[in-house]
């Protein structure tokens, strides 16, 4: 499988969805797990590639041989791409919401915060336990499954609220 080609296809899809919705960026629920970390990273790469400013070493074809671009070559390419882009083009944003409960894994929370820092993401941490407790105080015989489902619904509501606030699309992740 050609993973670079697959990544480009996914990044193109992300950009297409955001552009077609005329959104300014994406909102993602970041748990610290692999699924949300991968989606956040793909969104960042998608938006960077749309601006012609992908970071890191990039491969290129040179007479049939794969070589690595130097930092200077990448900087020159980035400057050239910026010169060609419209002056009013805005960088698409990524806003991460970290929404732990009292039962959330502390290591995952730490991982989510580290990912936000390493990807330079705008983020907000919202402790959803008080919201969960207020709702559960009105319910009868709450089991673990109902608590888990309610936590997911609260997170979804917050994601869509921030989506509307910022003019962003919600990017979903699975929990597999």
Model-inferred region functions:
Residues 1-176:
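ATP-dependent adenylation/nucleotidyltransferase module used to activate substrates
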